Amino acid sequence: MKGQEARGEEPPSGTVAARRLRRRLDSEARILAAAEQIFAETGFSGATTAMIAAKARLPKANVHYYFRTKRQLYQAVLQRILEAWLASGDGIRAEADPATAFTDYISAKMEASRRQPYASKVFANEILHCAPEVDDYLRDQVHRWVQDKARVIDRWVAEGRMRPVDAPHLFFVLWAATQTYADFDCQMRAVLRRRRLAPGDYAAGAALIIRMVLGACGIRTGNGADRRRVTQGAERRG
């Protein structure tokens, strides 16, 4: 059974190994969720594993069993949100419909801001400090991800399915527009005079961002219309 876990295979349901795996995954999830909130509220320097254990309602020894150091736990929080953000763009493929691909990506990024606001804030704080823990990840995985998606967008442009855009800067805009609903939610709550943002706020924000992006990129929707060639004249009218 240990060999199965090491290979990433799930043991048969109901076995001792399966129950052990479920407990491990549950404990790790609780620790990571607690760590997201503590790191977001206190920063890396202000956080302690004792605070995280208390938030997770687990013994401190359990935290150190799964994550040997506070830094390792902090890196795990950052890696988890970064991997989720990159995975949300899996639909941006050459054979995909541009309107659907961007709609799904923006919706997924906004949902991440709604469901994991603390993780987003941890990342934002990391970036404000020049990304000491994720600089290599940004220069490697994120760089390659952006270059891969840029090639897809360039192909869509060449096929006349959207207007020419600077793809990396398009993603910078999308990241800022969606992540602000997590990173600066207190600003929005104050302006809207609400204790917390409602699901409708995220939906309204996503809908607006989608309309703006599709419009600016000259992507038509419905009945394959987005595949029609975007002419220079249409670009000037936009």
Question: What feature does the model see in each segment?
Answer:
Residues 75-104, 152-154:
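Amphipathic alpha-helical linker/stalk segments
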Residues 1-15, 108-111, 115, 143, ...:
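C-terminal peripheral helix-coil segments that are non-catalytic and often amphipathic
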Residues 27, 70, 77, 81, ...:
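Hydrophobic/aromatic residues within well-ordered alpha-helical segments
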Residues 31-39, 109, 213:
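Short hydrophobic clusters on alpha-helical segments that form packing/core surfaces
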Residues 30, 38-72, 76:
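Helix-turn-helix
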Residues 114-136, 184-193:
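Amphipathic alpha-helical segments used for helix-helix packing
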Residues 122-126, 140, 173, 177:
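Short acidic/histidine-centered micro-motifs embedded in hydrophobic/aromatic stretches
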Residues 90-121, 159, 167-174, 203-206:
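Hydrophobic alpha-helical connector segments
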